Amino acid sequence: MSVKIGRNDPCWCGSGRKYKACHEAFDEKIARYASQGHIVPQRNIIKNAEQIAGIKESCKINIAVLDYIEKNIHEGMNTAEIDKIVYDMTTSMGGIPAPLNYEGYPFSVCTSVNDQVCHGFPSKDVILKAGDIINVDCSTILNGYFSDASRMFTIGEVSPEAERIVRVTKECVELGLKAAKPWGHLGDIAYAINSHAQENGYSVVEEIGGHGIGLEFHEEPFVSYVTPKGSEMVLVPGMMFTIEPMINEGSPDFFVDEDNDWTIYTMDDGCLLYTSPSPRDLS
């Protein structure tokens, strides 16, 4: 329950402005949505201008690292080399790799190759070869602010099937971004992504989705890609979250690697993940 604030009191967002000149009308609008039965965000996941600026600075490091990998990833490279690049570049720019030691995760990045859905472990034994597709999932902490993004890369000449699913998955993300509008719903994003995937003969992983980002690595809300249009949480200015659907060639089912309890594989052949180049900012 939010504490009642006087109209002339400092706003809860930390802006220093009076509540009546800052978030009073905003809160009244959220209250109207809530009274109609909509799921509305709590204040702790709504970022102020200072926080958004800090998160964007973290994003700059994250994007720079992914840009460098994009220019230098190649056939014959092992994924442990990618992990070293991420650690060295991130720390040299004053950041911290967010995955490193997060809930016991032992690397600075996730490198998921071919049928790995996500959370692939970098390894000297995983050597990239022509025809591979790889997702590099990079996350950065800078001055306490978190960013999270990944990119898909194709190695050498890939099959038409691989090229097609990479293209369609990117289209899914772009459609999801277009659907993410203030005072819309998370379900609008899901509908845009799931519809396009299914129209092209693909499935969307249901149990794994996007998440809030910024002050912690994983925040509310959970961003599903299979819920109906107009459902789930209302999107309001100041929310920040990732849009990172996992699109499968076969069924949406997956299993977790029993050896490391992290890496997730598709139950049949072929799975890709693609995310936006930075968290979606609804400011």
Predicted features by range, described:
Residues 62-130, 179-218, 233-241, 249-257:
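Active-site cores enriched in adjacent His and Asp/Glu residues with nearby glycine-rich loops
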Residues 248-271:
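A conserved acidic, glycine/proline-rich C-terminal tail/linker
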Residues 1-45:
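Acidic/negatively charged segments and metal-coordination signatures
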Residues 139-143, 246-250:
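Short, charged beta-turn/beta-strand-edge "cap" motif at the junction between a beta-strand
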Residues 274, 278-283:
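Single conserved hydrophobic/aromatic residue that forms the stacking wall/gate
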Residues 129, 153-165:
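Acidic, low-complexity central loop/insert segments
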